[in-house]
Amino acid sequence: MRPWKIGNLPVDFDVETKKVLKALPAAHAALAELKGVASTIPNQSILINTLGLQEAKDSSAIENIITTHDDLYKSGLNLNAFKSLEAKEVQNYISALKKGFELISESGLLTNNMILEIQEILENNKAGFRKLPGTELKNSATGDTIYIPPQDPQEIMDLMTNLEQYINTPGMQDCDPLIKMAIIHFQFESIHPFYDGNGRAGRIINILYLILQKLQNLPVLYLSNYIIKNKQVYYNSLQQVREENLWEEWILFMLKGVEITARETIELISKIKELMLYYKHRLRATYKFYSQDLLNNLFKHPYTKIEFVVKDLGVSRLTAANYLNVLAEDNMLRKEKLGTGNYYINTELFDLLSKRSKQP
């Protein structure tokens, strides 16, 4: 099998077919509703943390990096001695996602240098774009080679330069931004510019592109859960574009993913909001030390600790410990020991987030 010859963008095929145009309104309506619902959560870091961690877990699972919710949230406590290798990789993902969001928020662009910076955080190395031949995509069950991406370093660089222009130049292809997102994702996956972490980097690019296009304000629309549930269709659709130019099927698959995921995320955010309101009423009615900052802390960190409360509330360590211990005694939180320290679980939020990922 020889490396597949990738063409430059824009795509020289009809990507706005009747079926695609018919599918667009539902995807856009769901996205618009999600954008509005997300804005009703008072502290944006709550959604970025809780949904971002879930996305990090799901996106890594596609690459067979498996971690439990318990390991994931423990790793967020920043106790390195207790982090599994898998949990560290998932934490790298959330760090890369946050960095990407920060970079595009500052510049309004998504450049190759930013993509390289995201990849560096993801993989914890500075390998950059591939310079050595030998990368092949294989069937995990049979070991057969199913796709060989470009091998020449200059070709990879040229294709990534073209992709950078396509992402940041609206006039290069006059089509709906959701169609462009599907094309960008296909192109990046096909270039496969890195030695490792291409899938995770590509899914971060999806999220950031939606924000660049002002279809979302926050990184909360995550397609990884949809891809996990439709993994074989996802890989088959990518390959069918390469082999048969079946762009319509690929774009429809991605549009359906946007619509379904947006609807699921709206439901999840609504449940988080309801739970926050329940906690707010209980805390405010029962404890003199209630504050919005404390409530935000308990939802920003499904597993919180004294140091987090000290930082978020600006109180002493003794005061923070007292707050958390009182809440644990009253079963608002569950206190657990880890090494020489303690952490505190918002069990209802934990159950909500972990059940979501188990849905068929």
Residue ranges of predicted features:
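FIC/Doc superfamily catalytic core
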Residues: M1-P360
